[in-house]
C-alpha cells in the first residue's frame, strides 16, 4: 500500500505540480540568449519532447518500483526516478524561459509508460531491467539527435540536453550491471515505433 501511495503521489507531482530539482539546472549559470522566432520555435518543440520523455520516465520507474520485491532494486529505481525528476524540472524551466509549455497530452504519456512498466516488471526483475536498458539507450540516442538539431546559439538548452544524455547512458549501464536481460528484437522495434509516435505528437501538441 505504501508503494502505491508513493506512485500516486509521483503521478500527481509529475502531472500537476511544479517539479523541484535536487540539483540546479546546467543552464542556470549561462547567460540568456537572443534567439530568432524560428530558433525559439524549434528549441521549444525539442524541449517539449524532452519534457515528455521525463514524464514517461517517472511513470516507468514508479511502476517498476511498485512491482519488484527486491528492496535493493526498488531503492535503485527510486534513485533513478529522483534523477529523472531533475531532468523534468530542468526541461520545464527551459520551456518557461522559451515562453512555451509542456505537452497537453502528458497524462496520456504518463499512463502509457506506467502501464508498460507494470507489464515489464511482472515478467521478472531482469526483464524489467532489460526494458530500462533499452529505454535509456533509445533516449540517449534521441538526445544526441536533439543536440545536432538544437540551434547552436541556444546554449542553455544544449547544456541541459548534454547533461541529460550523459545521465541516461549511466542509467543504462547501471541497469545492465544489475542483471538486465536483453529484449528480443520485436520488443525493441515496438518500443521505437511507440517512441516515434510520442515524439512526433509531442513536437506539436
UniProtKB/Swiss-Prot annotation:
Pathway: Cofactor biosynthesis; ubiquinone biosynthesis. Its EC number is 1.14.99.60. Its main location: membrane. Its cofactor is Fe cation. GO terms for cellular component: plasma membrane. Binds 2 iron ions per subunit. It is a peripheral membrane protein. This is 3-demethoxyubiquinol 3-hydroxylase. It comes from Acidovorax sp. (strain JS42). The lineage of its organism: Bacteria, Pseudomonadati, Pseudomonadota, Betaproteobacteria, Burkholderiales. The gene is coq7.
Amino acid at each position: 500500500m505504501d508503494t502505491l501511495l508513493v506512485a500516486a503521489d509521483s503521478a500527481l507531482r509529475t502531472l500537476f505540480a511544479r517539479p523541484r530539482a535536487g540539483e540546479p539546472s546546467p543552464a542556470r549559470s549561462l547567460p540568456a540568449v537572443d534567439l530568432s522566432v524560428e530558433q525559439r520555435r524549434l528549441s521549444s518543440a525539442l524541449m517539449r519532447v524532452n519534457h515528455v520523455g521525463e514524464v514517461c520516465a517517472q511513470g516507468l520507474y514508479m511502476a517498476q518500483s511498485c512491482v519488484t520485491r527486491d528492496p535493493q532494486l526498488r531503492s535503485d529505481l527510486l534513485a533513478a526516478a529522483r534523477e529523472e525528476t531533475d531532468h523534468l524540472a530542468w526541461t520545464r524551466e527551459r520551456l518557461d524561459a522559451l515562453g512555451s509549455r509542456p505537452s497537453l497530452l502528458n497524462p496520456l504519456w504518463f499512463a502509457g509508460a506506467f502501464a508498460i512498466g507494470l507489464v515489464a516488471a511482472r515478467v521478472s526483475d531482469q526483464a524489467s531491467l532489460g526494458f530500462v536498458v533499452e529505454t535509456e539507450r533509445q533516449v540517449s540516442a534521441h538526445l544526441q539527435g536533439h543536440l545536432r538539431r538544437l540551434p547552436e546559439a541556444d546554449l542553455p538548452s544544449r547544456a541541459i540536453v548534454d547533461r541529460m544524455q550523459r545521465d541516461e547512458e549511466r542509467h543504462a549501464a547501471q541497469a545492465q550491471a544489475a542483471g538486465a536481460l536483453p529484449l528480443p528484437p520485436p520488443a525493441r522495434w515496438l518500443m521505437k515505433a511507440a517512441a516515434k509516435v510520442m515524439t512526433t505528437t509531442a513536437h506539436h501538441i
